[in-house]
Amino acid sequence: MPKIKTLRGAAKRFKKTASGGFKRKQSHLRHILTKKTTKRKRHLRHKSMVAKADQVLVVACLPYA
């Protein structure tokens, strides 16, 4: 059976945790930042976890994670 290819874009975006979840970076922090409050930007800097409903899709993209 051939190897399954890892989706490279997903490999750069998600990191697997020891408990089996996936860490991800928050969006909305690339441009148009002047209208966003400092508090909002500060909270967006922190990592977040992938939701349970989306975890199946991430696992399919990262077969060896």
Curated annotation (Swiss-Prot):
The cross-references to Gene3D superfamilies, in alphabetical order and at most eight, read: 4.10.410.60
For region Disordered, the annotated ranges are 1-26
Biased composition (Basic residues) is annotated at 10-26
Is Ribonucleoprotein included in the keywords of this UniProt record? yes
Q: One GO BP annotation here?
A: translation
Molecular function terms from GO: structural constituent of ribosome
Q: Name one Pfam family in it.
A: Ribosomal_L35p
Choose one Gene Ontology CC annotation of this protein and give it: cytosolic large ribosomal subunit
The family note in this entry says:
Belongs to the bacterial ribosomal protein bL35 family.
Q: What is this protein called?
A: Large ribosomal subunit protein bL35
Q: Which organism is it from?
A: Histophilus somni (strain 2336) (Haemophilus somnus)
Q: What is the lineage of its organism?
A: Bacteria, Pseudomonadati, Pseudomonadota, Gammaproteobacteria, Pasteurellales
The primary gene name is rpmI
